[in-house]
Amino acid sequence: MSDVRLESGAKAPAFSLPNQNEKAITLASLAGKKAIVYFYPAAATPGCTKEACDFEESLNVFTAAGYSVVGISPDLPKKLAKFVKDQDLHFDLLSDEDLTAHKAYGAYGLKKLYGREYQGVLRSTFVLDEKGAVTLALYNVKATGHVTMLKKLLGL
């Protein structure tokens, strides 16, 4: 388990990561607008595809409520570009190849699968206010049903 656990009221850790088009996206560039930042293990895998498509299907709901949506994974921008195109996504996916942002947000740590322990990406979602403060931190979420749960938690 990661030693980092962000809680409501915490300042979101800064990041500068390339998106699917290799354009740097920073936490500061999200300032002034509420944001949903979600961390996922790998693009184009069943669970991550489901989660991304669920965010896409609800994107109008989130944007109408003033939220931008950003996904972060260890994938390279080239893979993210293909994933965005294949799934027709209309939000940025960021590449965190060295896991710096994952670790800063506590979205990387000890996982268990079939009795085996290993280090990996912890599927996590953070809701940030206009000033970059965490208003909601959700760790170890399930891909299926996560976006529906998030909308309920946000009253959307």
Residue ranges and their predicted role:
Residues M1-L156:
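Chalcogenol-based redox active-site neighborhoods
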